[in-house]
Amino acid sequence: MTISWSELVRTAAEESTAALEKGADRNWSGTAGDLQWSARETLSHIALGVVGYAGLLIARPTDRYITLFGSIDSQAPAPAALEGIRIAGTLLATTVDTTPEEVRAWHPYGHSDRTGFAAMGALELLVHGRDIARGLDLDWSIPDELAAPVVSRLFPDAPTGHAPTDTLLWCTGRVALPDLPRRNGWRWNGEVR
């Protein structure tokens, strides 16, 4: 990997929010891509996940989720809401930087380490950022160099021979690949390998 795990999170936050800022004046109450959530609800989901992953690395529970829940103010204008996403990304990236390699924490998709939680956070930022961009009719694609480490870390059985972004979108049930139909159900594997 040519980018550090913390820089992956920071860059995913910056790239996705910069793309979404171009749609700040659009209707954020519409659905985010094929999700049932609105663009605003999806932002809160991203914040919840990314802040939660930082909290898991800090608290290090072995059998439960943490009790801190982060969200975006539903009344905040889009630029301020996106600032909240960048803050969440910075919190996770800083936590990844300061967490020792041997630390493990609970997650329902497998106890994980700092690299796993960084990849989970980047996935939330990138994939849901794309969902929102699609809902706002913005032209934005996940950069392959950000998708590749996420696929490598969270989807050990991912198909090979495709662009990393296409593979990530297939792994998360967003698209079909040649000879592989779109997935109806999916989950990542955060376990340490």
Predicted stretch roles:
Residues 1-8, 12-15, 22-35, 52-76, ...:
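Structured surface interface patches that mediate subunit assembly and partner/cofactor docking
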Residues 45-46:
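Glycine-rich loop at the start of a catalytic domain that most often binds anionic cofactors/ligands
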Residues 42:
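Extended, alpha-helix-rich binding/interface surfaces that flank or overlap catalytic cores
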